[in-house]
Amino acid sequence: MPRQLDRYDMSEQQGISIIMVNTEEVPGKTITKTLGVVSGTTVRAKHVGKDIGAFFKNIGGGELKAYTELLGESRDQAVQRMLEEAVGRGANAVVNVRIATSAITPGASEILAYGTAVVVE
């Protein structure tokens, strides 16, 4: 069974769709042009009210759902920004996609999405 590709709709109004994979090639497609590295980043800070709840949850154990949601939203925003840059360069796919995180300050984290913008046929 063939692996399904990740396809993102950039905007319903624009009607733009782009392929995103974490491999060097897009299965079933040929890379005809490499447009270079593209990236998207966001820096998010924790919410004080959520920190209090997380403190108590941390004592008892379990998932910190508020932080899971925050990281998920941050990841999505970084990916969206990366894809917007790729579309701006004329790409219809991004290969070798990676996502990295780093602590900027004790209360804030950076999420970086990056990959190589390409044209595939």
What are these regions (language model features)?
Residues 1-50, 88, 111-121:
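N-terminal presequence-like segments and the immediate start of the first folded domain
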Residues 23-26, 99-104:
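Short, solvent-exposed loop/turn elements at beta->coil junctions and helix N-caps
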Residues 38, 43-44, 50-98:
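Short, well-ordered alpha-helical segments
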Residues 93, 107-109:
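Positively charged, aromatic-enriched nucleic acid-contacting surfaces
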Residues 104-105, 115:
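C-terminal structural segments of small proteins and small subunits
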